């Protein structure tokens, strides 16, 4: 559609340096990582994209560079070519503001235990969390992620501005807070998921779904509106057996209709009896692997 209205769009495909970063060939996104070491190697692979990007910029000479927050080196590269760099954030203003508040003030360091609540300072709302709920790099157990986080924050400070996957009606207080408190230029470009209109487009966002999309919709349509709980912990988290079983027990005890997305595709036997019971009662749907989240 953009080409039809006269925009000159050209797509350049480059090879992701999986093997150069000690990743299996074809491992090109976080959903394909299965261990903390693979996770760290994935971000090492991202740094190897710098030279490839510089070669493209040398050839194409664009007026601006838009790069995800996971590429902190992109600001320096853009500066080398004399063009502004805009950071793209796939998360909301609220998530960004909460993260930056914790990053700068480190309120979790004042807690006595991992389960003690602390207040995230300076936000428009009173938000409380525990140290257990924090990413590993905030807890000092992941040096590689800490380095990347520090570089990303510094890169955001020195970049020209930020594009955020949000819209004003969703969180006006936090869009203002981000600009006024953190002093960033920011533009709302969301929700970007609306670019996908057809069922097939929605079901294939990110990668192919591991469940038949029509089977999923048929199950959802059999339930009352607003009656189904959706549980997903993101593409990178895989739980130990004990936690998976506790979640399963909690869902079964609640008696709530649910869709549960599990990234542990290898846990078929562990939850086999649970799956049989919920399938018989038609209370739940378990998706192992990638879920058609936008479609759902």
Sequence positions of predicted segments:
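Nucleotide-sugar-dependent glycosyltransferase catalytic domains
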Residues: 1-294
């Amino acid at each position: 559609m953009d080409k039809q209205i006269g925009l000159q769009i050209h797509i350049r495909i480059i090879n992701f340096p999986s093997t150069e970063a000690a990743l299996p060939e074809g491992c090109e996104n976080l959903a394909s990582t299965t261990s903390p070491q693979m996770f760290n190697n994935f971000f090492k692979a991202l740094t190897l994209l710098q030279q490839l990007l510089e070669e493209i910029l040398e050839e194409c000479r664009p007026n601006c560079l838009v790069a995800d927050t996971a590429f902190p080196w992109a600001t320096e590269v853009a500066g080398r070519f004399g063009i502004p760099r805009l950071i793209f954030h796939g998360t909301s203003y609220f998530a960004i503001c909460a993260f930056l508040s914790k990053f700068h003030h480190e309120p979790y360091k004042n807690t006595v235990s991992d389960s003690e609540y602390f207040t995230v300072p300076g936000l428009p709302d009173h938000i409380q969390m525990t140290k257990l709920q924090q990413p590993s790099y905030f807890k000092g157990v992941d040096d590689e992620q800490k380095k990347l986080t520090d570089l990303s924050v510094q890169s955001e400070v020195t970049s020209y501005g930020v594009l955020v996957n949000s819209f004003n009606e969703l969180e006006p207080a936090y869009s203002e807070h981000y600009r006024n408190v953190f002093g960033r230029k920011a533009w709302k470009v969301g929700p970007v998921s609306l670019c996908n209109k057809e069922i097939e487009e929605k079901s294939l966002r990110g990668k192919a779904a591991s469940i038949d999309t029509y089977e999923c919709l048929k199950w959802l349509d059999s339930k009352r509106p607003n009656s189904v709980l959706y549980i997903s912990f993101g593409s990178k988290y895989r739980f130990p057996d004990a936690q998976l079983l506790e979640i399963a027990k909690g869902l079964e005890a609640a008696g709530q209709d649910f869709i549960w997305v599990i990234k542990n595709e290898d846990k078929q036997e562990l939850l086999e009896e649970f799956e049989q019971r919920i399938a018989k009662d038609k209370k739940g749907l378990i998706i192992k692997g990638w879920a058609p989240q936008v479609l759902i």
